[in-house]
Amino acid sequence: MPDRHVLGRRARASGRRAERATLWLMWLMGWDPVAENLKLGRFELDLLMTRGDELRALEVKSRRPGAWTTADTALTYEQRRRLQMALRSYLDQVPWPGRVTFQRVSFAGWRCRFHPPERWDGLKIPR
C-alpha cells in the first residue's frame, strides 16, 4: 500500500483535475472565470465565475469511486463557515452589485454532480 505522502499527492492531483474540469464545464455553460484557488488570508475559494450580473463561488470536492466519505457529503459545517468567510472577505475587497451564489460540485472518479446553487447569504452561518 502506498504511504500517506503518495496518497496525499494523488488526492491533491485529483482535486486539481476536478477543479480544472469544473472550470471548463462552467465555461461551456457560458460562465467566465474570475479567480481560481483564490487565497484570502487563511481562507481559499476554489473557483469564482461570473455570468451576467451573477457571481458564483464554487467549492469542488473530489473523491475516488467507492471512497468511505463521498464527495456529496464532504462539506462540513466548519468548511461551509470558512467558505462563507472567504466570500465575505472577497466581497469586502471587490463589492459585487449583482447576485452572489454558492455552488458545490462533486466528483467521484470522472462522474460529476453539480448541486443546486444557493444564495450566498442562504448558507445561514453567523458572523
Sequence positions of predicted segments:
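Acidic-basic catalytic patches of nuclease active cores, encompassing PD-(D/E)XK
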Residues: 1-36
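Catalytic cores of nucleic-acid endonucleases
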Residues: 2-5, 62-111
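Hydrophobic residues on conserved beta-strands that form the core of alpha/beta folds
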Residues: 33-35, 57, 102
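Positively charged, solvent-exposed patches that mediate nucleic-acid binding
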Residues: 28, 41, 50, 105, ...
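Conserved catalytic cores of phosphodiester-cleaving nucleases, focusing on short active-site segments
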Residues: 26, 45-70, 83
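Short acidic/glycine-enriched loop/turn segments that link adjacent beta-strands
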Residues: 40-43, 110
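Short, low-complexity, polybasic intrinsically disordered segments
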Residues: 106-127
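Short polar/acidic secondary-structure junctions
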Residues: 38-40, 96
